Regions:
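Short, small-residue-biased leader/transition segments that mark boundaries at the very start
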Residues: 1-2, 186
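Short beta-strand elements that form the blades of beta-propeller/WD-repeat-like
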Residues: 3, 36-41, 106-119, 169-177
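Long, internal scaffold/assembly segments composed of regular secondary structure
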Residues: 3-59
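Blade-edge beta-strand/turn elements of extracellular beta-propeller
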Residues: 4-20, 72-91, 130-144
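Beta-rich catalytic cores
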Residues: 25, 105, 125, 149, ...
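Structural signature of eukaryotic scaffold interfaces centered on beta-propeller domains
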Residues: 25-32, 91-106, 152-168
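Short, solvent-exposed loop/turn segments at conserved positions within beta-propeller repeat blades
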Residues: 50-68, 120-126, 179-183
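Generic long, charged, amphipathic alpha-helical segments
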Residues: 121-176
Length: 187
């Protein structure tokens, strides 16, 4: 892991040793005194195994079974210490936050729920939306329903919103497709 001071040059790069993982999406990053805090989705297995019963496309399908969870890293710029751990262990990814809070402490993150293979999941299908309170680790979950799948969501703050407003005052937007009525999609 590396950081470069926003006021520095390439010579200011710092390396930090973390538990091995793959990070597809970061929710947010901010400073707290000597610490840089980063929330994101952590995968411990970026090279999943294929199952033999899926034929010649099995290796491609294996990569579409993303296993990741909401995770927090803390990097101390003064001492080099790293603290890290799960915020939650639910399989989620494609995380978003209110863009007004990019680079400053944020409380909420919105993730797509991805069922694991042993939960009846197949490939990268989003079956629900999960709202995390990263301060408490609590979550609210909305399932789209049987045969209904969502797209990567975006967060849209209400018109005219600033960081003086409630961080959660906006809209999480995803396109949802009902595969039972393929000619119909919902926002």
């Amino acid at each position: 892991m590396l950081f470069r001071s926003r006021h520095g040059s390439g010579g200011d790069i710092r390396w930090f040793d973390c538990e091995p993982c793959y990070i597809l999406h970061v929710s947010n990053c901010w400073e707290e005194g000597d610490w840089v805090v980063m929330d994101g989705c952590r995968s411990t297995n970026p090279m999943p195994s294929a199952t033999s019963d899926e034929g010649e496309l099995s290796h491609m399908l294996a990569y579409m079974r993303l296993e990741a969870n909401n995770y927090r890293w803390r990097f101390n710029l003064r001492t080099g210490e790293v603290r890290e751990g799960d915020i939650d262990d639910l399989n989620t990814e494609f995380n978003k936050t209110n863009p007004l809070y990019a680079g400053v402490k944020s409380r909420y993150a919105y993730h797509q729920r991805i069922p694991l293979l042993e939960e009846g999941g197949h490939t990268l299908r989003f079956t629900g939306l999960v709202k995390y309170d990263n301060n408490t680790g609590s979550r609210q979950q909305w399932d789209y329903g049987d045969g209904v799948f969502g797209s990567e969501a975006v967060y849209a703050p209400k018109a005219g919103a600033t960081r003086d407003n409630d961080e959660d005052d906006g809209y999480v937007i995803t396109l949802v497709t009902d595969t039972r009525e393929i000619g119909r999609a919902h926002v």
